[in-house]
Amino acid sequence: MSRIGLKVINVPESVTVTKNGNEITVKGPKGELTREFDPRIKFEQEDGVIRFSRSNENDKAIHGTMRANLANMIEGVVNGYKKELKLIGVGYRAVAKNNVLTLNVGYSHPVEMKAPEGVTVTTSSATDVTIEGISKQVVGQFAAEIRAVRSPEPYKGKGIRYADEVVRRKEGKTGK
């Protein structure tokens, strides 16, 4: 049984957390994030510590989710989030210009993807893509969308994968 919702969140001095109705805004050195939270969960802030409490046991799941979301928001405005992708395959390459990522991954046409607001896309080499931002959800979602353009296949391992991803390989069919 998870008790994540009961853990307190320590707020760094460089971060301010304000509540306005159901919206919680987190401001930090890297930027500002706002999110609407469920009104069934109570929010208490004192002496740089935030606690969430629920009124009944039926709200356990949303209790832990809200606590994790706020902890991720605080982490994002302090340190930010980063995802790295690798393109593996002959002729596969990526170019980032003006926050538009152009992928050449074996299709008859290049695939262009515009980065969402608050996300920066850079390419350190033709096969390495780095996505950075302050929202864990937006960075992860955009990285997943890029990976879905050409996900790694199990026979040769070609495709777009996360830098730390291990692709399970399959053996090809045997001849007669």
Swiss-Prot record:
GO terms for biological process: cytoplasmic translation. Pfam families: Ribosomal_L6. GO terms for molecular function: rRNA binding; structural constituent of ribosome. It comes from Lactobacillus delbrueckii subsp. bulgaricus (strain ATCC 11842 / DSM 20081 / BCRC 10696 / JCM 1002 / NBRC 13953 / NCIMB 11778 / NCTC 12712 / WDCM 00102 / Lb 14). PANTHER family: 60S/50S RIBOSOMAL PROTEIN L6/L9 (PTHR11655), LARGE RIBOSOMAL SUBUNIT PROTEIN UL6M (PTHR11655:SF14). Keywords: Ribonucleoprotein, Ribosomal protein, RNA-binding, rRNA-binding. NCBIfam families: L6_bact. It comes from the Bacteria. This protein binds to the 23S rRNA, and is important in its secondary structure. It is located near the subunit interface in the base of the L7/L12 stalk, and near the tRNA binding site of the peptidyltransferase center. PROSITE patterns: RIBOSOMAL_L6_1. This is Large ribosomal subunit protein uL6. GO terms for cellular component: cytosolic large ribosomal subunit. Transmembrane segments: none annotated. Belongs to the universal ribosomal protein uL6 family. Part of the 50S ribosomal subunit.
